[in-house]
């Protein structure tokens, strides 16, 4: 576990990071060009979103060739160079693989459509019901039915996601063999990590049936045989190598995640789960607006941290990624008077937890949601689908746009803001997605020139994790659970105790400090606090972490 307990992983959405060709799309050489910046931040691994050949119906998660590079991003030589140059800087490369489905443009699916029985069995082809309707009533994660009818046929194929993303049948050993070959191909290329997309939906039941209680997910989420599949994947590919693996787990539960990530189970290094990012979803609905339920947020964090600590599971720690709106205006305040303290509060909240922190590109400089005003500014397939769905459900276009400004995945996919030049220094061409309007004020160049910027606070967080074993693997205990607006916890090991306090409020707040920490060292504060007392008055959005050495 130590190989990833001290690391911080930085997520790059290649399409939006840095463009070296002027075509408006970020590329692999653009990541290589910015390695020195990432080394200065202190991260030790870069997770890249998909860069494979793809029709780009779901921004690369519709993969048409697992072992090639889309010319949009460069060539295989560029990936080889990136891996080599990153390694020189003690940075590993983690790639994103989608093992649940392929693009309908993938040769496997094309051969299946052409009637090849070998590849036909790679996918879920099923006959329509007697009345011609889809085989089941399952709902796609992107809206609509999860089955698509083949033209001129009574057959359908299953797609839990976009209609161009056909689900693979993991019960077929030939499918598993082909996917293991893909993973080993990239290990041989020097890749040191894998982020495995929607991994816990790969195991479907033998018989697919209607769901009269929901949308079908209860049949395939953490489905039958999932742990056996992951053990086989581990054994056949990355198991005996120093490879870090993280599984993205959709609508999962703690018990399964402990099994996925406990090293004794020999499945994965860690898991992504999203329960904490649904605390502003009324009745679990993403496309309705509501305030964050802070008590629920605290409860989720504490429950997962305690269970994972006690049962030796391992969490990926994150607020932001390419599928989520940015956290800054969502979980804290993006108002100018609170901007710095909110951004640093969010960073400290998860970086002192037990797990491996992930920093999403731009988070370290305080990038925010762009809140584009019209649907013409958005390109995300899920957003465009729901623009139509929500209006059909009776909302006005203006009401729908207010939801999209807060919920769209494009919020986190706007180009990285490097400087105050045209297009924020991202490209000399026309960017594939608009640059946020605040790029003149919020950018890397400005952050690096100010030693009290959000960037340097994140740099300190990353360095502290490398330095202190108690942050890496110490036990986790909730603290001050009854205090509203306060999220706090203790970390401890044989030699050290750590108390991390985070005030999610816009007003001052008084708390009592436990006696054991009255002589503690201030490890980190976003208000430059130097002294502490038994009664502390916390400032708005203050984060304070104390460290106390235990007496021998």
Predicted region positions:
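Loop/helix patches that line or flank the sugar-binding groove of alpha-linked glycan CAZymes
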Residues: 4-5, 228-244, 251, 259-273, ...
């Amino acid at each position: 576990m130590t190989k990833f307990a001290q690391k911080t992983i930085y997520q790059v959405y290649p399409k939006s990071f840095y463009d070296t060709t002027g075509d408006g799309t970020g590329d692999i050489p653009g990541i290589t060009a910015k390695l020195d910046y990432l080394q200065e931040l202190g991260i030790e691994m870069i997770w890249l979103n998909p860069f494979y050949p793809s029709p780009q119906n779901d921004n690369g998660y519709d993969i048409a060739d697992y072992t090639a590079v889309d010319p949009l991003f460069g060539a295989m030589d560029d990936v080889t160079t990136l891996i080599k140059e990153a390694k020189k800087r003690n940075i590993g490369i983690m790639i994103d693989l989608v093992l649940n489905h392929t693009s309908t443009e993938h040769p496997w699916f094309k051969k299946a459509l052409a009637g090849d029985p070998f590849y036909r069995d790679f996918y879920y082809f099923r006959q329509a019901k007697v009345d011609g309707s889809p085989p089941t009533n399952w709902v796609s994660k992107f809206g609509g039915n999860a089955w698509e009818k083949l033209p001129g046929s009574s057959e359908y194929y299953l797609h839990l996601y976009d209609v161009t993303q056909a689900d693979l049948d993991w019960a077929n050993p030939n499918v598993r063999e082909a996917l293991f070959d893909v993973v080993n191909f990239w290990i041989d290329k020097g890749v040191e990590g894998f982020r495995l997309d929607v991994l816990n939906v790969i195991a479907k039941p033998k018989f697919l049936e209607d769901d009269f209680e929901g949308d079908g997910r209860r049949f395939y989420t953490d489905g039958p045989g999932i742990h056996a599949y992951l053990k086989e994947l581990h054994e056949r590919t990355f198991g005996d190598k120093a490879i870090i693996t993280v599984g993205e787990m959709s609508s999962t539960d703690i018990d399964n995640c402990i099994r996925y990530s406990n090293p004794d189970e020999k499945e994965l290094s860690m898991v992504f789960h999203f329960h904490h990012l649904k605390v502003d979803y009324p009745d679990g609905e993403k496309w309705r607006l509501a305030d964050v339920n802070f008590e629920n947020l605290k409860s989720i964090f504490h429950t997962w941290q305690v269970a994972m600590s006690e049962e030796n599971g391992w969490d990926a720690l994150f607020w932001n990624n390419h599928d989520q709106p940015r956290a800054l205006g969502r979980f804290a305040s993006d108002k100018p008077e609170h901007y710095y303290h909110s951004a640093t509060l969010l960073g400290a909240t998860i970086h002192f937890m037990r797990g491996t922190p992930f920093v999403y590109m731009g988070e370290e400089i305080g990038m925010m949601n762009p809140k584009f005003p019209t649907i013409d500014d958005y390109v995300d397939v899920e957003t465009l689908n729901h623009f139509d769905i929500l209006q059909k459900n009776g909302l006005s276009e203006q009401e729908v746009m207010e939801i999209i400004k807060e919920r769209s995945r494009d919020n986190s996919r706007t180009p990285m803001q490097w400087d105050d030049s045209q297009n924020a220094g991202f490209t000399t061409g026309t960017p594939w997605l608009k640059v946020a309007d605040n790029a003149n004020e919020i950018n890397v160049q400005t952050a690096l020139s100010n030693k009290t910027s959000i960037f340097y606070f994140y740099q300190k967080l990353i360095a502290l994790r490398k330095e202190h074993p108690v942050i890496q693997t110490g036990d986790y205990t909730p603290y001050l659970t009854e205090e509203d607006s306060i999220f706090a916890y203790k970390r401890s090991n044989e030699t050290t105790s750590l108390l991390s306090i985070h005030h999610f409020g816009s007003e001052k707040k008084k708390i009592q400090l436990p006696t054991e920490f009255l002589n503690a060292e201030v490890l980190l504060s976003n208000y430059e606090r130097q002294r502490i007392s038994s009664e502390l008055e916390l400032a708005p959005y203050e984060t304070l972490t104390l460290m106390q050495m235990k007496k021998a």
